[in-house]
């Protein structure tokens, strides 16, 4: 995935200091070393963990959130979050395939974005991927109909939702 993203972004010029780092985030020792190094090198960081959180358990997500919030220069964090409803649907549709690849979707907290409050992260904004895809005309006709339905406020519960969330520490 990182090779694909690097290829797409290779000619782009970021408007800030940008680093893409390959690291097995399940290696806690290496992760903590990296966080310390980055915190020492920057004054104000936006951490992006696209595609990561859904593979974690609730406990791992909490640990990760605490570790990030303990660094005073990690001001913002952006990642994609799924609702329990979407997790159930994805497990039903893709579960066997994911298990074959030793990848299991696990994290979709019942309390939604509020899960992260107790770990030092305040949700600033959440954008539905479905609604955003409709706005930029990236959906087929059937999905456009789904995008027209209103979404619940607060925790999404059994409603199938995924979005990108921006948090502040």
Can you annotate each of these PLM segments?
Residues 1-169:
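Alpha-helical subdomain
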């Amino acid at each position: 995935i990182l090779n694909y993203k690097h290829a797409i972004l290779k000619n782009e010029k970021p408007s800030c200091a940008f680093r893409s780092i390959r690291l097995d985030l399940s290696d806690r020792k290496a992760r903590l070393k990296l966080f310390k190094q980055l915190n020492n090198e920057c004054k104000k960081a936006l951490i992006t963990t696209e595609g990561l959180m859904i593979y974690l358990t609730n406990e791992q997500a909490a640990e990760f959130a605490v570790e990030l919030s303990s660094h005073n220069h990690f001001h913002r964090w952006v990642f994609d979050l799924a609702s329990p409803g979407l997790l159930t649907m994805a497990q039903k549709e893709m579960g066997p395939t994911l298990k074959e690849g030793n990848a299991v979707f696990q994290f979709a907290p019942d309390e939604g974005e509020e899960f992260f409050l107790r770990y030092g992260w305040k949700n600033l904004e959440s954008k539905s991927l479905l609604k955003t895809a409709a706005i930029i005309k990236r959906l087929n006709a059937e999905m456009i109909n789904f995008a027209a339905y209103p979404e619940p406020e607060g925790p999404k519960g059994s409603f199938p939702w995924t979005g990108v969330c921006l948090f502040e520490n």
